[in-house]
């Protein structure tokens, strides 16, 4: 009986919260080229709790790799179709630089099965590459920090 009540409550939550039931996106992987200064780190902040709701608390911290490639992955444990995000440079708990321009926007409803339809993805500089694998539910986002951005250390 308790299990049935929980299922009904969950179904009501989905209806009233506007959550679209898709169950396809499982994880988002990031690969960002950014030559940072000592002590700086690259994070992903965004419009959903998995990316801190635009704050560092709960955001996705990327990890430095050889060649100034920052990588990270965020597991998505709920159904989402749309979110916005930006890359930021952080040092000692303070955001030093936000990715310039408008927010990056991901609308999974507009991505084709081969994962190459960019009508569902928007990047201000048009210097991101997106690959969505419907079979394993993984979205890979690759980004090159622009050389002329003040947060970039050439």
Model-predicted regions and their roles:
Residues 23-24:
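N-terminal edge beta-strand
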Residues 19, 33-34:
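Beta-strand elements of modular eukaryotic interaction domains
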Residues 35-80, 90-112:
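Aromatic-rich carbohydrate-binding modules that target alpha-glucans
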Residues 116-154:
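Compositionally biased low-complexity segments at domain edges in trafficked proteins
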Residues 27-32:
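A short, amphipathic beta-strand motif
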Residues 2-17:
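Membrane-proximal basic amphipathic "stem/tether" segments
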Residues 81-85:
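Exposed beta-strand face motif in extracellular beta-rich ectodomains
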């Amino acid at each position: 009986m308790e299990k049935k009540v929980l299922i009904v409550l969950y179904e009501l939550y989905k209806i009233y919260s506007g959550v679209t039931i898709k169950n396809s996106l499982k994880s988002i992987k990031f690969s960002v080229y950014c030559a940072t200064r000592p002590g700086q780190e690259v994070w992903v902040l965004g419009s959903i709790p998995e990316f801190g709701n635009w704050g560092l608390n709960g955001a996705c911290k990327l990890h430095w790799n050889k060649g100034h490639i920052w990588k990270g992955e965020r597991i998505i444990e709920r159904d989402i179709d749309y979110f916005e995000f930006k890359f930021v440079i952080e040092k000692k708990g303070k955001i030093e630089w936000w990715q310039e321009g408008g927010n990056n926007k991901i609308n999974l409803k507009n991505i084709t099965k081969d994962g190459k339809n960019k009508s569902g993805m928007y990047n201000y500089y048009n210097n991101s590459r997106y690959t969505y694998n419907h079979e394993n539910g993984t979205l890979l986002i690759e980004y090159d920090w622009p050389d002329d951005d003040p947060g970039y250390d050439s």
